[in-house]
């Protein structure tokens, strides 16, 4: 049974939203992924949000570009946590999406990550689930420890060989 619902306004958002799916897979978290357009399929959006909990969904990640109404509209229908992913557009580089998602009225919160950063949305969803599921919390902690080790190893390497050699080795 999926614990996370990943939805997007268009299939053009999939290259961004797959990052959330990939990180959830890394944590071993079940998810469903589909297209739900707030503007083109409003009835589908309403039914998706209304019935998500019955399907076992505990967190929804919603990505959208442009007017980006999907995350906010879904949050207005469900009491489940909604994480909004602003998708970069060719017009305003995703700023329109970011502002649309982040500027929600009081009482209808949407947690918002950086433009095109569905990976962080997946990590945030895992952190939320980790409150209830100790195994997921353990995996999130291990992930963050691994990131810490990687940074410390890179810092040590840079300090040992200097920036010129470090950059040469990265090329």
UniProtKB/Swiss-Prot annotation:
UniProt keyword terms in alphabetical order: Isomerase, Purine biosynthesis
UniProt-annotated binding residues for substrate: 10, 13, 40
Gene Ontology MF terms in the entry: 5-(carboxyamino)imidazole ribonucleotide mutase activity
UniProt key word DNA-binding: no
Any GO BP annotation: 'de novo' IMP biosynthetic process
Record has Signal as a keyword: no
Pathway linked to the protein: Purine metabolism; IMP biosynthesis via de novo pathway; 5-amino-1-(5-phospho-D-ribosyl)imidazole-4-carboxylate from 5-amino-1-(5-phospho-D-ribosyl)imidazole (N5-CAIR route): step 2/2
Enzyme Commission code: 5.4.99.18
Domain of life: Bacteria
Catalytic activity: 5-carboxyamino-1-(5-phospho-D-ribosyl)imidazole + H(+) = 5-amino-1-(5-phospho-D-ribosyl)imidazole-4-carboxylate
Pfam family, one: AIRC
UniProt cross-references to InterPro entries, sorted A to Z: PurE_ClassI, PurE_dom, PurE_prokaryotes
Similarity remark: Belongs to the AIR carboxylase family. Class I subfamily.
Function: Catalyzes the conversion of N5-carboxyaminoimidazole ribonucleotide (N5-CAIR) to 4-carboxy-5-aminoimidazole ribonucleotide (CAIR).
Cited HAMAP family: PurE_classI (MF_01929)
Protein name: N5-carboxyaminoimidazole ribonucleotide mutase
Native species: Thermotoga maritima (strain ATCC 43589 / DSM 3109 / JCM 10099 / NBRC 100826 / MSB8)
Organismal lineage: Bacteria, Thermotogati, Thermotogota, Thermotogae, Thermotogales
Gene name for this UniProt entry: purE
